Protein backbone atom coordinates (compact mmCIF):
# COMPACT_ATOMS: atom_id res chain seq x y z
CA UNK A 1 0.00 0.00 0.00
CA UNK A 2 1.51 3.32 -1.03
CA UNK A 3 1.40 6.51 0.96
CA UNK A 4 -0.77 9.35 -0.24
CA UNK A 5 1.21 12.43 -1.17
CA UNK A 6 0.78 15.37 1.13
CA UNK A 7 -1.08 18.39 -0.13
CA UNK A 8 2.11 20.42 -0.57
CA UNK A 9 3.86 17.77 -2.63
CA UNK A 10 0.75 17.11 -4.71
CA UNK A 11 0.60 20.77 -5.75
CA UNK A 12 4.28 20.78 -6.71
CA UNK A 13 5.31 23.17 -3.94
CA UNK A 14 8.88 22.79 -2.74
CA UNK A 15 9.28 22.32 0.98
CA UNK A 16 12.30 24.05 2.52
CA UNK A 17 13.68 23.54 5.99
CA UNK A 18 16.23 25.88 7.50
CA UNK A 19 19.38 24.25 8.85
CA UNK A 20 21.41 27.29 9.93
CA UNK A 21 20.99 31.07 9.82
CA UNK A 22 23.60 33.81 9.90
CA UNK A 23 21.86 36.55 11.88
CA UNK A 24 25.12 38.40 12.38
CA UNK A 25 25.28 39.07 8.62
CA UNK A 26 22.15 41.26 8.79
CA UNK A 27 23.66 43.16 11.69
CA UNK A 28 27.11 43.76 10.22
CA UNK A 29 26.35 44.19 6.50
CA UNK A 30 23.96 45.95 4.13
CA UNK A 31 22.63 42.92 2.23
CA UNK A 32 21.67 43.60 -1.38
CA UNK A 33 21.28 40.77 -3.90
CA UNK A 34 20.72 37.20 -2.77
CA UNK A 35 21.60 34.03 -4.64
CA UNK A 36 20.76 30.37 -4.07
CA UNK A 37 23.78 28.11 -4.50
CA UNK A 38 24.25 24.39 -4.24
CA UNK A 39 27.14 22.96 -2.23
CA UNK A 40 29.62 20.27 -3.26
CA UNK A 41 29.61 18.15 -0.09
CA UNK A 42 31.00 14.79 0.97
CA UNK A 43 28.89 12.01 2.45
CA UNK A 44 29.92 12.57 6.07
CA UNK A 45 29.01 16.26 5.72
CA UNK A 46 25.46 15.43 4.65
CA UNK A 47 25.06 13.14 7.65
CA UNK A 48 26.40 15.82 9.98
CA UNK A 49 24.07 18.44 8.48
CA UNK A 50 21.10 16.10 8.95
CA UNK A 51 22.13 15.88 12.61
CA UNK A 52 22.15 19.70 12.81
CA UNK A 53 25.90 20.18 13.18
CA UNK A 54 26.45 23.05 10.73
CA UNK A 55 27.50 26.62 11.51
CA UNK A 56 27.85 29.35 8.86
CA UNK A 57 28.31 32.39 11.11
CA UNK A 58 32.08 32.63 10.58
CA UNK A 59 31.89 31.76 6.89
CA UNK A 60 32.27 33.87 3.78
CA UNK A 61 32.42 33.17 0.08
CA UNK A 62 35.54 33.78 -1.97
CA UNK A 63 36.08 33.86 -5.73
CA UNK A 64 39.09 31.81 -6.79
CA UNK A 65 40.01 31.08 -10.43
CA UNK A 66 36.50 31.76 -11.72
CA UNK A 67 34.76 29.61 -9.10
CA UNK A 68 33.15 30.50 -5.78
CA UNK A 69 34.10 28.72 -2.56
CA UNK A 70 32.61 28.81 0.92
CA UNK A 71 35.39 29.36 3.44
CA UNK A 72 35.24 29.24 7.24
CA UNK A 73 31.89 27.50 7.59
CA UNK A 74 32.00 24.68 10.11
CA UNK A 75 30.41 21.25 9.73
CA UNK A 76 31.32 19.19 12.76
CA UNK A 77 31.65 15.48 11.89
CA UNK A 78 29.68 12.86 13.73
CA UNK A 79 31.51 10.46 16.01
CA UNK A 80 30.38 7.61 13.76
CA UNK A 81 32.05 9.22 10.71
CA UNK A 82 33.81 6.92 8.30
CA UNK A 83 37.21 5.63 9.34
CA UNK A 84 38.73 5.69 5.85
CA UNK A 85 38.28 9.44 5.38
CA UNK A 86 39.72 12.22 7.49
CA UNK A 87 36.95 14.76 8.06
CA UNK A 88 38.03 18.42 8.03
CA UNK A 89 35.53 20.70 9.77
CA UNK A 90 36.42 23.97 8.03
CA UNK A 91 37.47 22.89 4.56
CA UNK A 92 36.77 25.03 1.49
CA UNK A 93 33.51 23.93 -0.14
CA UNK A 94 32.72 24.71 -3.75
CA UNK A 95 29.49 26.60 -4.41
CA UNK A 96 27.47 25.57 -7.45
CA UNK A 97 26.08 28.53 -9.39
CA UNK A 98 25.31 29.21 -13.05
CA UNK A 99 28.16 30.75 -15.03
CA UNK A 100 26.17 33.98 -15.63
CA UNK A 101 25.58 34.35 -11.88
CA UNK A 102 29.26 33.73 -11.13
CA UNK A 103 30.32 36.36 -13.68
CA UNK A 104 27.84 38.90 -12.29
CA UNK A 105 28.98 38.30 -8.72
CA UNK A 106 32.63 38.36 -9.75
CA UNK A 107 32.36 41.83 -11.32
CA UNK A 108 30.51 43.26 -8.32
CA UNK A 109 33.02 41.80 -5.84
CA UNK A 110 36.14 42.88 -7.74
CA UNK A 111 35.08 46.31 -9.02
CA UNK A 112 32.55 47.60 -6.52
CA UNK A 113 34.01 46.25 -3.28
CA UNK A 114 31.21 43.91 -2.27
CA UNK A 115 31.61 40.86 -0.05
CA UNK A 116 29.83 37.52 -0.41
CA UNK A 117 28.26 36.51 2.89
CA UNK A 118 26.33 33.29 3.60
CA UNK A 119 22.94 34.11 5.12
CA UNK A 120 21.12 30.76 5.34
CA UNK A 121 21.70 27.04 4.90
CA UNK A 122 18.58 25.00 4.13
CA UNK A 123 17.13 21.89 2.53
CA UNK A 124 15.43 22.26 -0.83
CA UNK A 125 13.88 19.01 -2.08
CA UNK A 126 16.55 16.73 -0.55
CA UNK A 127 19.45 18.97 -1.53
CA UNK A 128 21.40 21.32 0.70
CA UNK A 129 21.31 24.90 -0.56
CA UNK A 130 23.16 27.97 0.66
CA UNK A 131 21.79 31.47 0.34
CA UNK A 132 24.59 33.96 -0.24
CA UNK A 133 24.20 37.72 -0.42
CA UNK A 134 26.22 40.51 -1.94
CA UNK A 135 26.94 42.78 1.00
CA UNK A 136 28.72 45.97 1.99
CA UNK A 137 30.01 46.41 5.52
CA UNK A 138 28.18 48.70 7.93
CA UNK A 139 29.93 51.42 9.90
CA UNK A 140 29.38 51.59 13.67
CA UNK A 141 27.04 54.58 13.34
CA UNK A 142 24.92 52.59 10.84
CA UNK A 143 24.58 49.78 13.37
CA UNK A 144 23.52 52.27 16.07
CA UNK A 145 20.98 53.87 13.72
CA UNK A 146 19.52 50.46 12.91
CA UNK A 147 19.22 49.66 16.63
CA UNK A 148 17.48 53.00 17.28
CA UNK A 149 15.06 52.38 14.42
CA UNK A 150 14.29 48.89 15.72
CA UNK A 151 13.64 50.24 19.24
CA UNK A 152 11.43 53.01 17.86
CA UNK A 153 9.35 50.53 15.83
CA UNK A 154 8.92 48.33 18.92
CA UNK A 155 7.84 51.31 21.06
CA UNK A 156 5.46 52.49 18.36
CA UNK A 157 3.81 49.06 18.19
CA UNK A 158 3.53 48.96 21.98
CA UNK A 159 1.80 52.37 22.06
CA UNK A 160 -0.58 51.37 19.25
CA UNK A 161 -1.54 48.15 21.03
CA UNK A 162 -2.15 50.02 24.27
CA UNK A 163 -4.21 52.69 22.47
CA UNK A 164 -6.32 50.10 20.61
CA UNK A 165 -6.93 48.15 23.80
CA UNK A 166 -8.17 51.26 25.65
CA UNK A 167 -10.47 52.36 22.83
Swiss-Prot record:
<feature type="compositionally biased region" description="Basic and acidic residues">
    <location>
        <begin position="139"/>
        <end position="158"/>
    </location>
</feature>
<dbReference type="GO" id="GO:0070929">
    <property type="term" value="P:trans-translation"/>
</dbReference>
<dbReference type="GO" id="GO:0003723">
    <property type="term" value="F:RNA binding"/>
</dbReference>
<comment type="similarity">
    <text>Belongs to the SmpB family.</text>
</comment>
<feature type="region of interest" description="Disordered">
    <location>
        <begin position="139"/>
        <end position="167"/>
    </location>
</feature>
<dbReference type="InterPro" id="IPR020081">
    <property type="entry name" value="SsrA-bd_prot_CS"/>
</dbReference>
<dbReference type="GO" id="GO:0005829">
    <property type="term" value="C:cytosol"/>
</dbReference>
<dbReference type="Pfam" id="PF01668">
    <property type="entry name" value="SmpB"/>
</dbReference>
<keyword id="KW-0963">Cytoplasm</keyword>
<protein>
    <recommendedName>
        <fullName>SsrA-binding protein</fullName>
    </recommendedName>
</protein>
<dbReference type="InterPro" id="IPR000037">
    <property type="entry name" value="SsrA-bd_prot"/>
</dbReference>
<comment type="function">
    <text>Required for rescue of stalled ribosomes mediated by trans-translation. Binds to transfer-messenger RNA (tmRNA), required for stable association of tmRNA with ribosomes. tmRNA and SmpB together mimic tRNA shape, replacing the anticodon stem-loop with SmpB. tmRNA is encoded by the ssrA gene; the 2 termini fold to resemble tRNA(Ala) and it encodes a 'tag peptide', a short internal open reading frame. During trans-translation Ala-aminoacylated tmRNA acts like a tRNA, entering the A-site of stalled ribosomes, displacing the stalled mRNA.</text>
</comment>
<keyword id="KW-0694">RNA-binding</keyword>
<dbReference type="InterPro" id="IPR023620">
    <property type="entry name" value="SmpB"/>
</dbReference>
Amino acid sequence: MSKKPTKDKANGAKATKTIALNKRARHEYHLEERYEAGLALQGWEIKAIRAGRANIVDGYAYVRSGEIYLIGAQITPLIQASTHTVPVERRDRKLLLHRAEIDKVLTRVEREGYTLVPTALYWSSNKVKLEIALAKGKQNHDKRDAAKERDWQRDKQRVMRRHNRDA
